[in-house]
């Protein structure tokens, strides 16, 4: 029969949400910080460009997920790309984070169930 759409359902959902956020937030904050700082460094390097590439040297970029060789003028964009990949990858390769992601989706379903039955 499932959980009755009551305040108990809402309380259980909130408890699960709190527990899952404790585990998810540190990984997400770290990943989002690297993405945001990457966006700002790309924006500043693009605004400093004169239109033609100054150098054709190749730089090696790597993190725990991937490794890539790119021309140096595109290094900022590819660093951003790599940080995004590692952010997504860290959520899906870390078992605790994956479990928490599943929990969060279940919680959202519980909330939807609760509010649907309120109306």
From Swiss-Prot:
Which segments cross the bilayer? 9-29, 73-93, 95-115
Q: Which UniProt keywords apply?
A: Host membrane, Membrane, Transmembrane, Transmembrane helix
Compartments where located: Host membrane
Which cysteine residues pair off into disulfide bonds? none
What is this entry's stated membrane topology?
Multi-pass membrane protein
- Superkingdom of the source species: Viruses
Q: Which GO terms describe its cellular component?
A: host cell membrane; membrane
Primary localisation category: host cell
Protein name from the UniProt record? Putative transmembrane protein ORF119
């Amino acid at each position: 029969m499932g959980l009755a759409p009551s305040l108990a359902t809402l309380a259980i959902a909130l408890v699960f949400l709190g527990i899952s956020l404790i585990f998810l937030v540190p990984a997400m904050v770290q990943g989002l910080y690297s993405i945001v700082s990457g966006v700002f460094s790309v924006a500043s390097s693009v605004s400093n460009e004169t239109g033609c590439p100054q150098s054709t040297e190749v730089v090696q970029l790597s993190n725990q997920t991937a490794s890539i060789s790119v021309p140096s003028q595109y290094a900022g964009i590819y660093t951003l790309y790599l940080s995004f990949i590692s952010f997504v990858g860290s959520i899906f390769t870390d078992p605790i984070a994956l479990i928490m992601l599943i929990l969060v989706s279940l919680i959202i379903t519980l909330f939807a169930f609760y509010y649907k039955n309120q109306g």
